[in-house]
Swiss-Prot record:
One of its GO terms (biological process) is RNA processing. Mg(2+) binds at residues 486, 492. Keywords: Cytoplasm, Magnesium, Metal-binding, Nucleotidyltransferase, RNA-binding, Transferase. GO terms for molecular function: 3'-5'-RNA exonuclease activity; magnesium ion binding; polyribonucleotide nucleotidyltransferase activity; RNA binding. It is an enzyme of class 2 (transferase). Its EC number is 2.7.7.8. Involved in mRNA degradation. Catalyzes the phosphorolysis of single-stranded polyribonucleotides processively in the 3'- to 5'-direction. It comes from Borrelia duttonii (strain Ly). This is Polyribonucleotide nucleotidyltransferase. SUPFAM superfamilies: Eukaryotic type KH-domain (KH-domain type I), Nucleic acid-binding proteins, Polynucleotide phosphorylase/guanosine pentaphosphate synthase (PNPase/GPSI), domain 3, Ribonuclease PH domain 2-like, Ribosomal protein S5 domain 2-like. Its cofactor is Mg(2+). Residues 654-666 have a biased composition (Basic and acidic residues).
C-alpha cells in the first residue's frame, strides 16, 4: 500500500514514500528533497552465519547519469565502478547505521540507495542517507532505529539547514550530522577555521531536525503497521568455562596489556591466550563450536582491563595519562628530487607526505551528475599492509578513500586561490607505521610537505584523534588514541585545525548518552593537543618557502584582450607553435584571455612572455623595434615588427643617424652583366645597399595613419 509523508526541512519538503517501488525488497523508500530523488532498498540473505563478531553489512550508494539528464562520458556509455564520491556517501550511510544492527542476526545485509533524479542544487547524498535509514527502519530486519541525518552550513553568521551546492561552496562550515532519538551518532565535515562553539551550535541545530525526521519515520509505523521482524539467528552465548578462564589468565593478561610497544604487547597478549587455549584443549573443553566463544571471552577480559585502568587509575596501556600525547618527530626535505616532502612520526604512527606541483593540464576532471568539475587539489592516502606488520594486497579500498578525503578537507581551506597560485597540487600520504590516527598524521605531514614545496598556505594544520571511555558514573576523554583505544572505546573523534580554528572533523559515537558538555570538553582537550602538535611542527617549518622547488614546473601568467587571442594562436596555430618550440614552453590559452606558460627555465619563460606581449601590444609612434626585412620592392621594404605586425620603410625616409648616411644612400653599383649596363636591383636597394631580405634592422615607428598602417624609419642602436 502506497504511503507518503512529508516534513519541512530548511527551504524544501522532505518527502518519504513507500509501497510503490521495489516491493520485493525487505524494505524500500523513495525520498525526495527539492528536485533530488533517491530510492533506497535493503535486502538480507537467507543463509545464516553464526557467532559473527561483526555485522555483515554493505552499502552501495550509486548515482545514475540519467538523473541529471546526462549520458556518461568516455568510450563506454554505462555507469562503471563506484566513483570516490559514491564510496564516500556509502561510508556516510554505513557508519551511523552499522552499530544499530544486532550481530546475532547473522545474515548479510545490503543497502542500495540509487539517485534517480537531481536538480543539481540540492545534494542527493543527504537525501540518500534518510532514504536508506527509513528503508531499514521499515523493513523486517531487526534494527534499533529510527535514525536520520541533516546537513548544516554556516554562512554570513547564520546556520543553513540542508544547504544548496552554492551555499556549501560559500560557507565556512559544512557538516553532516546523523543521530537517533537517543542522541548523536556521527558527525563529519570541513570548515574554514571555525571555533569550537560554532561547531557545537551547528550540531545542536542539526539534532533538532534529526529528531523531527525520526518522528516522521515512526509515523509510517502507525500508517502501515509494524512488521514482524525476522528472528535472530542465534542467542548470544558465552564460553561455558569463562569463570575458570578468568581465574587462569586475568592477572597474566593484565600484565601483558601494559607491555610497551604495539608489537610486543600484541605478542604478549597472544601468548597468554595461546597458553590458555592449550590448557582448555588438554581438558577437552574447547571444540569447533565454542572456540569463537573462547576468544571472545579473552577479548572481553582485555577490554575490561583496559577500560578499568583508564577510568580508575587514569593509566593507558602505553603508560600515558589521558591528556598526554605520544612523542612526536617531524622532518622535511627527506626526498631530494620531489617538490616537497615531510615525515611525521607520532609514537608508532608514521606518515610520509609528498607534494607534487603540476599544471592545469594535470587537474582531475570530474564527470559528475552534480555538474562537471576540475579539481586542482588532490590528496591520496595509502595504507599498505606492512604499516601494521602484515601481508596483503596493495590496493585502494573504501577506508583509504575515506581517510584521504578527511585529510584533504582538513587542508584545502588553507590553500591559496587558484588565481593566486595556478598550480595543480597533489599530496600523497604513505602510511609507513600505524597505531592509531594515521589520517591525522597525514594531515600533519601533508601540511608540512605543502610548505616545503613552496605552496603559500595560509596556516599550518595539525590533526589529533580523541577517544572516550565511560560508564554510568564517569567518563574520561583520551587525547591521541591508540588503535586499541579506538576499538575498545566509546567514541572516535578526529579534529584537525590551525591555531585559529577547526578545519576538519569526524566523529563516530558508539554510546547514546553523549552530552553537549562532553563534546565541549572533548573539543577543548583536542584544541590543547592541537596547539602542542603545531608548536612542534612550527619548530621544523613554520611558513611556506618563498620559492617553489627547483624541480617543480614554473608558471607565468599574463592577461590579454579577448580579441587578441587569435593573434597569439596564429593561422592554424602557427604562432603559438613557434613560441612553444623556440622557448621550450607549454602555452595554455583560456577563453577569457588568460594565458598561462608552463616550463622549467625561468629565463626562457620570461622571453616567451615578452614575445606574446609584443604580439598583442598596440604599436605607438616613437617605439623602436628590431624588425625583420620581409620583402623589398622599388618603393621600400616591408619590415616585420612582430609575427602579427608589419611596417613599411620607404625609400624616401631619412635615417636619424649617420650609419645609413649620404655615402650609403647615394652609392651606385655597376653590374657588367646588367642588360642596361647598370645594377638591376630596385632603387631602394640602391639607396640602402646593406638591407637584404631576412636581415634584422632597428627601426622606429614614425607614423601610424587612421587605417593602422605603420610607417618606419631607420633608428639608432
Amino acid at each position: 500500500m502506497r504511503k507518503i509523508l512529508k516534513l519541512k526541512i530548511g527551504r524544501e519538503d522532505l518527502i518519504l514514500e513507500t509501497g510503490l517501488l521495489a516491493k520485493q525488497a525487505n524494505g524500500a523508500v523513495l525520498a525526495t528533497y527539492g528536485g533530488s530523488t533517491v530510492l533506497a532498498t535493503v535486502c538480507c540473505s537467507d543463509s545464516i552465519r553464526e557467532n559473527l563478531d561483526f555485522v555483515p553489512l554493505s552499502v552501495e550508494y550509486n548515482e545514475k547519469y540519467y538523473a541529471a539528464g546526462k549520458i556518461p562520458g568516455g568510450f563506454i556509455k554505462r555507469e562503471g565502478k563506484p566513483k570516490d564520491k559514491e564510496v564516500l556517501v556509502s561510508r556516510l550511510i554505513d557508519r551511523p547505521m552499522r552499530p544499530l544492527f544486532d550481530k546475532r542476526f547473522g545474515r548479510e545485509i545490503q543497502v542500495v540507495p540509487t539517485t534517480l533524479s537531481t536538480d543539481q542544487m540540492n545534494p542527493p547524498d543527504i537525501v540518500g542517507m534518510n532514504a536508506a535509514f527509513t528503508a531499514v527502519f521499515l523493513s523486517d530486519i531487526p534494527f534499533n532505529g529510527p535514525i536520520a541525518a541533516v546537513r548544516i552550513a554556516y554562512l554570513n553568521d547564520e546556520f543553513i539547514v540542508n544547504p544548496s551546492f552554492d551555499e556549501i561552496q560559500d560557507s565556512v562550515l559544512d557538516i553532516v550530522v546523523a543521530g537517533s532519538l537517543d542522541g548523536i551518532t556521527m558527525v563529519e565535515g570541513g570548515a574554514n577555521e571555525v571555533s569550537e562553539e560554532i561547531l557545537l551550535d551547528a550540531i545542536d541545530k542539526a539534532y533538532a531536525y534529526i529528531k523531527q525526521i525520526c518522528d516522521l519515520q515512526k509515523e509510517f509505523i502507525y500508517l502501515i503497521g509494524e512488521r514482524e521482524k525476522l528472528p535472530l539467528a542465534y542467542e548470544e552465548k558465552v564460553f561455558e568455562f569463562k569463570d575458570d578462564l578468568r581465574s587462569l589468565i586475568y592477572s597474566e593478561l593484565k600484565d601483558a596489556c601494559f607491555v610497551r610497544g604495539k608489537l610486543n604487547r600484541d605478542k604478549a597478549i597472544k601468548l597468554v591466550k595461546q597458553k590458555a587455549y592449550e590448557h582448555f584443549s588438554s581438558l577437552e573443553q574447547i571444540n569447533d563450536e565454542n572456540e569463537i566463544l573462547f576468544y571472545k571471552a579473552c577479548d572481553d577480559f582485555e577490554q575490561e582491563i583496559v577500560r578499568k585502568s583508564i577510568l580508575e587509575d587514569n593509566l593507558r596501556t602505553d603508560g600515558r595519562t589521558p591528556t598526554q600525547i605520544r612523542d612526536i618527530i617531524a622532518e622535511v626535505d627527506l626526498l631530494k628530487r620531489t617538490h616537497g616532502s615531510a615525515l611525521f612520526t607520532r609514537g608508532e604512527t608514521q606518515a610520509l607526505a609528498v607534494t607534487t606541483l603540476g599544471t592545469s593540464i594535470d587537474e582531475q576532471v570530474m564527470d559528475d551528475i552534480d555538474g562537471d568539475k576540475r579539481l586542482n587539489f588532490m590528496l591520496h592516502y595509502n595504507f599498505p599492509p606492512f604499516s601494521v606488520g602484515e601481508t596483503g594486497r596493495l590496493m585502494t579500498g573504501r577506508r583509504e578513500i575515506g581517510h584521504g578525503h578527511l585529510a584533504q578537507r582538513s587542508l584545502e581551506a588553507m590553500l591559496p586561490k587558484k588565481d593566486d597560485f595556478p598550480y595543480t597540487i597533489r599530496v600523497v600520504s604513505e602510511v609507513l607505521e600505524s597505531n592509531g590516527s594515521s589520517s591525522m598524521a597525514t594531515v600533519c605531514s601533508g601540511s608540512m610537505s605543502l610548505m616545503a614545496a613552496g605552496v603559500p598556505v595560509k596556516e599550518q594544520v595539525a590533526g589529533i584523534a580523541m577517544g572516550l571511555i565511560s560508564n554510568d558514573d564517569k567518563y574520561v576523554i583520551l587525547s591521541d588514541i591508540l588503535g586499541e583505544e579506538d576499538h575498545l572505546g566509546d567514541m572516535d573523534f578526529k579534529v584537525a585545525g590551525t591555531k585559529n580554528g577547526i578545519t576538519g572533523f569526524q566523529m563516530d559515537i558508539k554510546i547514546s548518552n553523549v552530552t553537549k558538555q562532553l563534546m565541549r570538553d572533548a573539543l577543548e582537550q583536542a584544541r590543547i593537543g592541537r596547539m602542542h602538535i603545531l608548536s612542534i611542527m612550527d619548530s621544523v617549518i613554520s611558513s611556506s618557502r618563498g620559492d617553489i622547488s627547483v624541480n617543480a614546473p614554473k608558471i607565468v601568467q599574463l592577461q590579454i584582450d579577448i580579441d587578441k587571442i587569435s593573434l597569439v594562436i596564429g593561422s592554424t596555430g602557427k604562432t603559438v607553435k613557434a613560441i612553444t618550440d623556440e622557448f621550450e614552453v607549454r602555452v595554455q590559452i583560456e577563453q577569457d584571455g588568460r594565458i598561462t606558460l608552463f616550463g622549467t627555465d625561468n629565463l626562457k619563460m620570461q622571453k616567451a612572455k615578452a614575445k606574446i606581449e609584443s604580439i598583442v601590444r598596440e604599436p605607438k609612434v616613437g617605439e623602436i623595434y628590431d624588425g625583420i626585412v620581409k620583402k623589398i620592392n622599388s618603393f621600400g621594404a616591408f619590415i616585420e615588427l612582430t609575427p602579427t605586425k608589419e611596417g613599411f620603410l620607404s625609400n624616401r625616409s631619412r635615417s636619424r643617424d649617420d650609419r645609413y648616411g649620404s655615402d650609403i644612400r647615394h652609392s651606385r653599383y655597376s653590374n657588367r652583366n646588367s642588360r642596361y649596363g647598370r645594377d638591376n636591383r630596385s632603387s631602394f636597394s640602391m639607396r640602402f645597399p646593406r638591407l637584404e631580405e631576412g636581415q634584422i634592422v632597428k627601426v622606429r615607428i614614425s607614423d601610424i595613419d587612421k587605417f593602422g598602417k605603420i610607417e618606419l624609419e631607420l633608428a639608432r642602436d
